[in-house]
Structure formats: structure tokens, C-alpha cells
Curated annotation (Swiss-Prot):
Record entry for activity regulation: May be inhibited by divalent cations.
Disruption phenotype: Cells lacking this gene show an increased sensitivity to chromate.
Function: Catalyzes the reduction of quinones. Acts by simultaneous two-electron transfer, avoiding formation of highly reactive semiquinone intermediates and producing quinols that promote tolerance of H(2)O(2). Quinone reduction is probably the primary biological role of ChrR. Can also reduce toxic chromate to insoluble and less toxic Cr(3+). Catalyzes the transfer of three electrons to Cr(6+) producing Cr(3+) and one electron to molecular oxygen without producing the toxic Cr(5+) species and only producing a minimal amount of reactive oxygen species (ROS).
Designated name of the protein: Quinone reductase
Cofactor(s) needed for function: FMN
Taxonomic lineage of the native organism: Bacteria, Pseudomonadati, Pseudomonadota, Gammaproteobacteria, Enterobacterales
Record note on temperature dependence: Optimum temperature is 35 degrees Celsius.
UniProt catalytic activity: a quinone + NADH + H(+) = a quinol + NAD(+); a quinone + NADPH + H(+) = a quinol + NADP(+); Cr(6+) + 2 NADH + O2 = Cr(3+) + superoxide + 2 NAD(+) + 2 H(+); Cr(6+) + 2 NADPH + O2 = Cr(3+) + superoxide + 2 NADP(+) + 2 H(+)
Disulphide linkage map: none
A Gene Ontology cellular-component term: cytosol
Gene this protein is translated from: chrR
């Protein structure tokens, strides 16, 4: 394979010190040699979805830019916390805007989900709600291996903003390797 797979990360957290942000920032450093991982812009500036705004003003430039970067990528890694047993509102809002575009950026797109939390189950409930949403968008979600980073605060270095726990790094590296193989399998 001569060209690297282009993978983008979509961060579901808006918080500056986000543990999930730390996971996402670690991914480019541990990606297999056949893959390049780049972060998508923050979803913080995307306005709340409003069909009236869409009809009267069209799609926000932030949404159009996000969609184009997703379209250009070979795959998307969604890295997100779990809020109240589900998907964070900011991430759901970004997905709602993306779902309204005529040229669906996530349709047929390989997607990997990673969740982390300070609790022991690592955002598991969010993963399953997110999978339900992505079914509607016709995204191709990789089922296994899953990453649910429990007690993540003990596995990162807040000074460097990266994952430092070797077991977690090994799991994430293995998952990215599997995602690269998944992308190759489902590419049309």
C-alpha cells in the first residue's frame, strides 16, 4: 500500500482538559505506519440545529467544512465522553447538522467509536446510543475491538495531555490497526 489511509478524529467533548481529547491527541502518535490521523476542527462553534435556520440561511460554514473533511477521509474515529448515559449534546448536534446535508458525509464511511470516562465502564452506554444514530446515517461502524476507557483519569498525563498507561496504549494501537484493516475491507 503506497498511500497512507487518511483518518480524522471527531471529538465529542468541548472541555479544554477533556480526557477524551487526550485520547484523541495520542492517536496520531500510535497509529500504524499505514495510517495518518488528523483532528477535525472543534464542534464548539456549530450552532444548535434549527430547521428554520437551515431553510432560511442554509448550512453553517463550520458544518460544510466539517462535512468536506469527513468526505475526504478514509475513516472517522469518534472519540467522546458519555453524558447522562448517552451522547453529549454538542456531538449529537454536530451529527444532526451533518445528517441534513444532501451529500451525506458519513454514508458508507468507516467509523470507529472510542469512549472514555472517569467511571469503570468507560462510556459504554454512549457507544450503543451512538451506534443507533450512525445506523440511520448509513455509516459503517467497526464492531470490534471496542475501546471503553474506564477510570481514564489514571491513564493519562494531564501535563502532556496524552495517554501514558501502556495497556491502554497497546489496546488503542491494536484497535487502530484493526480499523485500518476494516477500512481496506469495506472500501469500494
Amino acid at each position: 500500500m503506497s498511500e497512507k489511509l487518511q483518518v480524522v478524529t471527531l471529538l465529542g467533548s468541548l472541555r479544554k482538559g477533556s480526557f477524551n481529547g487526550m485520547v484523541a491527541r495520542t492517536l496520531p502518535k500510535i497509529a500504524p505506519a499505514s495510517m495518518e490521523v488528523n483532528a477535525l476542527p472543534s464542534i464548539a462553534d456549530i450552532p444548535l440545529y434549527d430547521a428554520d435556520v437551515q431553510q432560511e440561511e442554509g448550512f453553517p460554514a463550520t458544518v460544510e467544512a466539517l462535512a468536506e473533511q469527513i468526505r475526504q477521509a478514509d475513516g472517522v474515529v469518534i472519540v467522546t465522553p458519555e453524558y447522562n448515559y448517552s451522547v453529549p449534546g454538542g456531538l449529537k448536534n454536530a451529527i444532526d447538522w451533518l445528517s441534513r446535508l444532501p451529500d451525506q458525509p458519513l454514508a458508507g464511511k468507516p467509523v470507529l467509536i472510542q469512549t472514555s470516562s472517569m467511571g469503570v465502564i468507560g462510556g459504554a452506554r454512549c457507544q450503543y446510543h451512538l451506534r443507533q444514530i450512525l445506523v440511520f446515517l448509513d455509516a459503517m461502524v467497526m464492531n470490534k475491538p471496542e475501546f471503553m476507557g474506564g477510570v481514564i483519569q489514571n491513564k493519562v498525563d494531564p501535563q502532556t495531555g496524552e495517554v501514558i498507561d501502556q495497556g491502554t496504549l497497546d489496546h488503542l494501537t491494536g484497535q487502530l490497526t484493526a480499523f485500518g484493516e476494516f477500512i481496506q475491507r469495506v472500501k469500494i
